[in-house]
Structure formats: C-alpha cells, structure tokens
Amino acid sequence: MYRENHHIHFVGIGGIGMSGIAELLLHLGYSVSGSDLRSSATTKRLQDLGATIYEGHQAASCAGASVVVTSSAVAEDNPEVVQAREDKIPVIPRAEMLAELMRLKTFGIAVAGSHGKTSTTSLIGCLLSQTGFDPTIVVGGKVDSFGGNAKLGEGDFLVAEADESDGSFLKLSPVLEVVTNIDLEHLDYYTDIEHIKETFLSFIDKIPFYGAAIVCLDDENVAAILPQVQKRLITYGLTPQADVSADNLRFAAGRSTFRVRAAGEVLGEISVFPSGTHNVYNALAAVAIGLELEIPFGKIATALASFGGVQRRMQHKGEGKGITVIDDYAHHPTEIRASLKAIKETWPEKRLVVLFQPHRYSRTQALFEEFKTCFHQADCLIMTDIYEASESPIEGVSTEILLEAIKAHGQRYTRHIPEIASLATEVMPNLREGDLVVTLGAGNIVQAGEEICQLLGQE
C-alpha cells in the first residue's frame, strides 16, 4: 500500500488473527478502526495504540474506510459488510491484508497445518529474533517473549501463521513454508480430507523456485501428497528417513529435550518449552528453518532454549492447596490426545481432571467418532455446553449426547456442567490435593481455570 493515509477497517478486530494485523498496521502509520461484538483486553490494547474501536456491528462504523477487512467468522449479511459493498468499499479477507504485509518484506515464512501452527510460528519467530534477523511476526496467540500476537521488526523476514480454515491462505506468497500436518477439520468449508489435501498442494505450489516447503514426514496425509509436489522439499520428523530428525526424546520439568540429526550426522541436542512429543515436532520445524537460513546449530539451540511459550498452550495458570491448574487451546480430538498425553508424561503421578468446552456444533458433529475416545488419559472429564462460535444449534448434536457416547466407550467418570459461570464453584468441592486441573477448548473455558485459581487462593 503506497499511501499511509489509508483508513483500514476490521470487522471482528478483537479476534486473535485480526488484532495482530491491525497492530502492525498501526505501527506502520495507517489509520485503523474496527468493530467487535464486545470490548476485551485486546480491543483496549488496540485503542491505546490509536485504533478507533466500535462495540457491536453497525453500518456507520465503516464510513470513510479505504478497505474493510473481514475474518472467516464474519457473515456476508453483517451490516458493515453490506454497507461497505453498497459504498463500493473493497471488502477483503484477513489473509489478503496479511499478504499485503508480507509483500512489504523481502521474504515471507508462512506456517500452515491443522495443528501446531501457533506454537511453530512462535518458535520460528523466537529463533529469528534471537539470531539477529529482527523479523516481523504475526501469530494466532499471545507470545510471552514479545508480549502479544504481533511484532514489527526492521529485518527482511515476515513470519506468519497461515490460516487454512477457509482456503484464503492461498493468497499468501511466502518464500518458505511449513506444513505441520493435515487433518480432517473446518468441514464448514472443505468437503472432505481430499479437498483439504488438494488445497495444501496448491499452497505448496505457490513457493518460488528458490524457496522450499518444510513438511512433517511423519504425518500420513502430508506424506500422501509429497509425490505430487514439484517444489523443493525439506522433511522433518522422528523417522530417520526425514532430512531433519529427532531421537532420544525426554520430558522433564515441563520441557522437551531431544537429539537432532541432519544430513546423516548428529548436530546436538535441543531443549525447549513445553513438554510433549507434539512440541518436539514444532521445534523440529523451527530447527529446519534455522538450518535452511544457515544459522549455526549452536545458535539455534540457544535461541529455542529461551522460548517462553504461548498463552493457552500448556499454560500454567496457578496452583494452591496442592492443586495445579493448566490451560490449553486443544479443541480437536487430535490436539486433545496430544495435549493430554504430554501432560501425563510430565505429571504421571497426578489425578487429571479435565474441564472441556466443545467448540462449534459443526465440529462436534463432524468429529463425533473421534471425540468418543480422545479423553482416555483423563481421570475425570467434566464438559460444558457447546461453545457455538456464531453457529446455530444442529439437531442431534449436544454435550449430553457426546458424553453418553464417551461414557459408553470406557470413560469412567464424566459430568455435565452446562454453564461456564458455575463451573469453578461446582468443581471445587470435588478437587483434592495432588490434582491437576486442565481447561481445554477454543472458547472461553479459560475463565473457569482462572476462577479456580482465585478460589484456591481464597481458601
């Protein structure tokens, strides 16, 4: 964008992906406004940086905008979108604005995949920040090391999380791509797993001749598309067949430690936060990026060792009375299995009490079979009503039905507490010393964990 007097309006500006782009544009000197259904700490932060924020969606909010940016959650009948189209104001998806930011930098690194995108993007951002690249970073989570979900750097690289949920990540033109995995997800947009794989193939095909795709060889759906890829590939995984591989995995004190091999030789060890095999994969992708950029392995190891984590990813919320509270964003069965496995590996002696909030009726319906068995690591499973995320209820899809199926598949202790507001107070009497409470989900389940921490401090 060649004029800095552009007025950029975001519909749904409080979203984790939208707010990061808005923050970068503010730092670049653009006029930014935005609306969201309700105020939040995120919208307050943007307001403090100079954005004009509207609570709720009204047609007048986009008046005077040069362009209107929408997230995939914004419907076409949103009054601001309708008004913008009537006024001939361009309406673009979030990914198109991210692509414009990427164009302003010399080299883009995009991280895509069904799971692990946020952590992997954050690790790569940390690596480049700690090794002198001073990258610009846009990520779908709040990263402790730079205190938010976006950072404007002076260097030539932009590191971004690429959202595949509506296919709009195809608007990006990165030089390096990471594909962490491909799983059945976002079936409100995709028809089936083959449709998802075809879209990822198109994404990889956007790499220029001098770029590369860094892909996880251990993921069966990623491996399935590799014969069709015509771009340069760098594979990573636990298999020794990968270009960059890990072995000798250990988990202790909340950290993952492993040995790295590349080009047939042992490079050394990496120790990174947090614990878990899935986090080893995330870190391996960052190692592969570092090696591709010719960063010495010792510097890669030092940089990744300094990584402090991402909020809502295996995040320690607090403890009291011998009870520990952890929060995690996992909401897909694959993510839930990985997170609970990692937690059990780290705290094998603790009773694991899981508070889960299902996210979206469509996801609960599409992945119903997978949800039946993904909680087996939990000693106690307590589930709230489904977080609708702007969806309408679907007949035959409910927490009660899901819990009955989970119980029928061997889960011993299950309980339904419909409302988040009463979850903490109803759970507290059943907790005992030595318990580990984990809040899981992509909605507002984190509030329950924070309330439990407060109650533990008051007793």
Curated annotation (Swiss-Prot):
UniProt record, GO biological process: cell division; cell wall organization; peptidoglycan biosynthetic process; regulation of cell shape
SUPFAM superfamilies (UniProt xref): MurCD N-terminal domain, MurD-like peptide ligases, catalytic domain, MurD-like peptide ligases, peptide-binding domain
Keyword flag ATP-binding: yes
Main location: cytoplasm
Chain residues that bind ATP: G113, S114, H115, G116, K117, T118, S119
Top-level taxonomic group: Bacteria
Family designation: Belongs to the MurCDEF family.
Descriptive protein name: UDP-N-acetylmuramate--L-alanine ligase
Protein's organism: Desulfotalea psychrophila (strain LSv54 / DSM 12343)
Gene: murC
